[in-house]
Amino acid sequence: MPSFDTVCEANFVEVKNAVENTAKEIGTRFDFKGTSAAVELKDKEITLYGDADFQLQQVEDILRNKLTKRNVDVRFLDAQKPQKIGGDKLKQVVKVKNGIDSEQAKKIQRLIKDSKLKLQAAIQEDKVRVTGAKRDDLQAAMALIRKDIADLPLTFDNFRD
């Protein structure tokens, strides 16, 4: 039976490159000279540092631009609230989403069930596998998921015939 997987995974090689390019630009820009503005990547979290709120926002804008240039969807980013870390310095943690959470997976499963297509959707850890008898139904399901679940940067892989 034909099937495909619906996943939500960022290309971490490109994320790492974008963070490195952001750090390089922060080091060379005149308006960041003599400030504590910085960016670092640990595991699946990007940490932004700055002296003021507007500076933190500028660092985040640079990061988003670099990610966009590297074809990484910025919907993968989940920015937390800025925190004070001593003196006037601020820190902001930006989590990189990886995988579909159970609530979104159930939403995708319900969407496919309600579509009246002859398909089955199974939640497998952090992805949703959709199986069906006809390839056309699978393609219709892909279009339906793209249209209705716009807040997640979903991709489809492991397409089997």
From Swiss-Prot:
Keywords assigned? Nucleotide-binding
UniProt key word Nucleotide-binding? yes
**Coiled coil stretches, renumbered:** none
GO terms for CC?
cytosol
- Transmembrane region positions? none
Q: What GO molecular function annotation could you give as one example from this UniProt entry?
A: nucleotide binding
Any S-S bridges, and between which cysteines?
A: none
Tell me the Gene3D superfamilies matching this sequence.
Answer: 3.30.70.860, YajQ-like, domain 2 (3.30.70.990)
Instruction: Identify the SUPFAM superfamilies for this entry.
Output: YajQ-like (SSF89963)
InterPro entries from the UniProt entry: DUF520 (IPR007551), UPF0234-like_C (IPR035571), UPF0234_N (IPR035570), YajQ-like_sf (IPR036183)
Q: Name the protein family.
A: Belongs to the YajQ family.
Q: What HAMAP family does this protein map onto?
A: YajQ
Q: Report the function annotation for this chain.
A: Nucleotide-binding protein.
Question: What protein is this chain from?
Answer: Nucleotide-binding protein Ajs_2750
Name the species this protein comes from.
Acidovorax sp. (strain JS42)
The major lineage groups are: Bacteria, Pseudomonadati, Pseudomonadota, Betaproteobacteria, Burkholderiales
